[in-house]
Curated annotation (Swiss-Prot):
Gene name, Swiss-Prot/TrEMBL: RF1
InterPro entries per UniProt: DNA-dir_DNA_pol_B, DNA-dir_DNA_pol_B_CS, DNA-dir_DNA_pol_B_mt/vir, DNA/RNA_pol_sf, DNA_pol_palm_dom_sf, RNaseH-like_sf
Catalytic activity: DNA(n) + a 2'-deoxyribonucleoside 5'-triphosphate = DNA(n+1) + diphosphate
EC number from the UniProt entry: 2.7.7.7
Record GO biological process: DNA replication
Originating organism: Kluyveromyces lactis (strain ATCC 8585 / CBS 2359 / DSM 70799 / NBRC 1267 / NRRL Y-1140 / WM37)
Protein name: DNA polymerase
PANTHER family in alphabetical order: DNA POLYMERASE, DNA-DIRECTED DNA POLYMERASE
Pfam families assigned to the protein according to its UniProt record, in alphabetical order: DNA_pol_B_2
Gene Ontology molecular-function annotations: DNA binding; DNA-directed DNA polymerase activity; nucleotide binding
SUPFAM superfamilies registered for this protein in UniProt: DNA/RNA polymerases (SSF56672), Ribonuclease H-like (SSF53098)
Family membership noted in the UniProt record: Belongs to the DNA polymerase type-B family.
EC category: transferase
Keyword vocabulary terms for this entry: DNA replication, DNA-binding, DNA-directed DNA polymerase, Nucleotidyltransferase, Plasmid, Transferase
Gene3D superfamilies registered for this protein in UniProt: DNA polymerase, domain 5, Helix hairpin bin, Palm domain of DNA polymerase, TPR 1 domain of DNA polymerase
Amino acid sequence: MNYIINLKMDYKDKALNDLRNVYADFDSLPLDFRQILIKDRATLLQKEDVEKKILERQEDAKKYAEYLKQSEIPERISLPNIKRHKGVSISFEETSEDMVLEPRPFIFDGLNIRCFRRETIFSLKNKILNMVKESSSFKNVSRQSVSFMYFKIFNKGKVIASTKSVNIYEDKIDERLEDLCNNFDDVLKKIIDVTYGYESLFVSETYSYVIFYAKSIYFPQPRCVNNWGNNIPNILTFDSFKLFTANKNNVSCIKQCSRFLWQKDFNTLEEMIEYKNGNICIVTPQLHINDVRDIKSFNDIRLYSESPIKTFSVIDNTITYLFYFKEHLGVIFNITKSRHDRRVTKFSPLSKFSDVKNITVCFDIESYFDPEKESNQVNIPFICCASIIYNKVIGNIVDFEGRDCVAQMIEYVVDICGELNISSVELIAHNGGGYDFHYILSSMYNPAAIKNILIRNNSFISFNFAHDGVKFSVKDSYSFLLCSLANASKAFLNEETFKKTDFPHHDLKTADDLYKVYKEWSSVNTEINHVVEKEKLLITSEHIVNFTKNDKSKTLIEWSKDYCRNDVLVLSKVWLEFKNAVEDIFNCELVDQTMTLAGLSYKLFQANMPFDVELRHPNKEDYFNMREALIGGRCISVNGIYKDVLCLDVKSLYPASMAFYDQPYGSFKRVSSRPKDELGIYYVRVTPNRNNKSNFFPIRSHNKITYNNFEESTYIAWYTNVDIDIGLSEGHNIEYIPFDSYGNIGYSWSKKGKIFEKYIKDVLYKLKIKYEKQNNKVKRNVIKIIMNSLWGKFAQKWVNFEYFIKSEDDIDFESEEAYKIWDTDFMLIKKIKESTYSSKPIQNGVFTLSWARYHMKSIWDAGAKEGAECIYSDTDSIFVHKEHFKKNAKFMLNGLKVPIIGSEVGQLELECEFDKLLCAGKKQYMGFYTYFQDGKPCIKEKKRFKGIPSNYIIPELYAHLLSGADKEAKIQFLKFRREWGSVKGYIENKTVKAT
């Protein structure tokens, strides 16, 4: 880098005279050579002049000191009879090298220095004030505390320059910070003007960095271990380490610690540091810790500013760890990894990993928003917690604070990858596709770097992006676990205390709410209120926080860190349990090769397919014709209030429908008539028979599917031969009609067979039984969800869209479908992707659902008594009066006559017997049943009301809706709406009625 030296003219003139005296022919030398000689000589003269002035000032200072001593001015020179106050400092420092604190350092024009932005320095205001308040809080002091701050510029570990210190006053903190920043700007300008001595700031190949240093000094009276508290034991045991307290009052703490560590008798800390060659790390409690016994974990301690080792991020057993608190020294020893079996886990340092090959980051975001104010409904992130998994070991949990917390996390992970030479990272969030992943978009400097975007129902399935040489693969754990994190922790974790906790999210509406002080709580409950207003039932809620009896209090932002850390630790544990179980069961890292559980199950099926079976993928026209025959599970409701009702569920209905019934395979053909003994999908005209009481044929009425409430109006539709045969048996009039100009009525497969039986029955189900016998609930649950998810991949929609992100300036709005990404200048582009063939064989998904209806009909026909009525049914369930059903009946399954009630795949399970059942429509029921706990009868409920959160489903809702045909209810509850790059939370006012 070129630079200009701005030396005063008198140095240049003197240098010129000196050179002319030395070289007689100086003026005849080449001009460039003369300028170099003048510059070098002038620089030397200036340096000599500066050194001379320093020596003169030192001499003057000595003379003035002698004068003060002779004048006996005690305020300036300590005399033997004058007591000096020994100061103790509280300090902290931050470096612009820290990409978490300063993700976007600015480069001062002309200098190779990474500087703090002013807003970053001002963000430290609360930390500075806490330091000042702590130093001024001590009562037993000799004089008033003093506080100050300054900047230093470092290059290759050396201090190059510094600002003058600025005193800190609590009531003028903003003004003082502004003065300090102005001082720093002045220093940089002077460096550019002077240049000499600062060459490294111009020409160094490496950047220089700025360190912000804040210090507060208080002046305590002499202290001992008693200042840690009374009767402090020799050893204190904490969550992840032990502390030697050096609790003997008659021996110095330095000597006690050196004896404890090395059987040495050192008298100063410097001697200890020298003995260990500087390999000592000194830590001290966080500012909020006033008693050593309040320390719980690593999260409650911080690096001491005078520590020789300047990092506490990685625990190294070759380092000695000392604990300094209230002028007393102790020793930290027996450092272990944080235990994972507690309710809330806080930050714990890494253990040094030498051979890391894979990094997974599980993260979660906490945000504030006001659902009742439209202008404040956007969820604003304020905390992002990340659990770093090294290979298959959970390491540290780190939290990032601020609106840019997600960006901070990404930068932090990149730094770790750089240290460990890792080039790819798996990034996991639970329900991230519907929430957390949106904030990755709005946190990136260039969202267009995001590639391979997969979206389903406006939720991200996955995507990837590269940042600073690290490739991030983003996945949603919900796409694999298919349940809430709370339920996943119950299914996959053995520790009873290791579970998701409650948090009063309702009180976090603005940034100011983050600093509300809350006592510790045990739970947060939602209390449901209901009232009838003008014939309409109104259901609302209020949140009740149940506080504990202890006096522990913290701000909500501090509580949220505990909550968020616990969540990511639970997610990390669940994700590892799931991945490890899949790998252990199938001897393959399948999760890394797939994006969803259905995709994983599909890959497993492919690996276990019969060699002579091919499943042909239809072209676009045939696909959409066949998909018209894809009809979801049977759902009926006979509204009313009932007593003594059996609640029956088929065990693994869809796996049974795939394993025990013929499926089409091989090539298919268009046919003009229905071939005998072949499976087919046909275009038909249907005239329903209203006298039918069986209700297993899906009738299309007013663009909906119904089974027991329809008109005798003729319609045209696609059905499988399985559904057609059910319809004919129920007396419906069904006629085959052509769908193309060649007179073809549908599609037929000449090959059929139980192609899923081996995979489901001989592989998955046998594994499930094996793990049940071993009482291995983790592997049992893995097999269960894999088995139940397979059919979904065969019913996959036509994938005809691709997504990518572009800058607003690059979009052709006339031809491109674009969606704004919140808080950025980028947009998500949705583009049609032309494909010739479907990605999956849709016909097998269609037949799975048809056989499921056939299976349910077979069970009903075998178990229902004459005149029995199915009160309610939804896909795999049957609610029927107890006296109307034969529990001991048998039906034909896979060529065998088996009991309808049993524990095998395809049989009914008696879940409970309702004492009372309220039905108000499809997917709108509530049943009460009795069970015994410790010999005492208890009442439990099973309920469902589609579109309504579970805790708002109350008996009064059903009673009101069933009291009259025109009765309505309005339910007010919190709901979220995704807007690319952000999420909005708002109050939904949903009106419902009996259907």
